[in-house]
Amino acid sequence: MTVLPVPLDPTRLWAVMPSYDDVPERSLVEELLGHVGGLIIVDDGSHPRVASELRRIATQTGVELVRHGDRRGKGAALRTGIGAALERSPRPDALLLIDADGQHRPEAVPAFLAAGSTAELVIGDRFADLAAMPWQRRLANQVSQRVLELTTGRLVRDTQSGMRLLRGRALDLPLPGDGYEAESGQLKTALVDGLDVTWVPIPTVYGGERSSFRPIRDSARVLAALIRPVERPNVRPVLPPRPAAADDSV
């Protein structure tokens, strides 16, 4: 079945930027605001100096800043930001998830919007330049790619990219786990549930910045999230009232 494109209005696209001890450049935030209707930065319990810098950036650019009192993990920060964004009125038609460390460039947003006219989940694909990725991250990504293909029966590309666009059913996808495994669990649920998932090329940008990703511990959690069955919300079904039988009254 051919899916007819539904153009996305950039003014109805909100961005969510989780941050733990990362301060986005003001120029990056301002450029991003030229592509989206609003931005929510989630400070995931950063150290005081970084928290102060994030407040400064938010004040200078007029974006919304939400702060966790202590570090909860990227998955928790994404849930906080997505929840806050979806409470906007009017409700956004789509959300863009983007990291604060400068790896994700605002100039890629139009490609995400174009792909989002037919797909429900759009993910940045760094596989065109794997050599620029640290070997630990490259290995973890390639292993998780194979595991996800085996467990879902669908071909996938970059499974670890944090730059994503969500629309339609993808806006309600769960983020199981508080760490980096949340994004992997989100992708697996989308694939299992038959959502239209696609990838768009983005640059592979790694500098000398410190990363909160712990290769052994976080890779193990990601792998576990890909192997375990898809989690469903524990919601009790609402049953219709049982018709009264003639012998119910004793």
What spans do the regions from the language model cover?
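Short beta-strand-to-loop acidic/aromatic patch adjacent to the donor-nucleotide binding site
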Residues: 89-103
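Short beta-strand/loop segment that forms part of the nucleotide-sugar
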Residues: 37-46, 66-68
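A conserved acidic beta->alpha catalytic loop
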Residues: 43-52, 102
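Hydrophobic helical membrane-anchoring modules
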Residues: 1-18, 22-24, 175-250
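Donor nucleotide-sugar binding loop of glycosyltransferases
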Residues: 21-25, 46, 74, 105
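Short, well-formed alpha-helical segments that are part of the catalytic scaffolds
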Residues: 19-35, 49
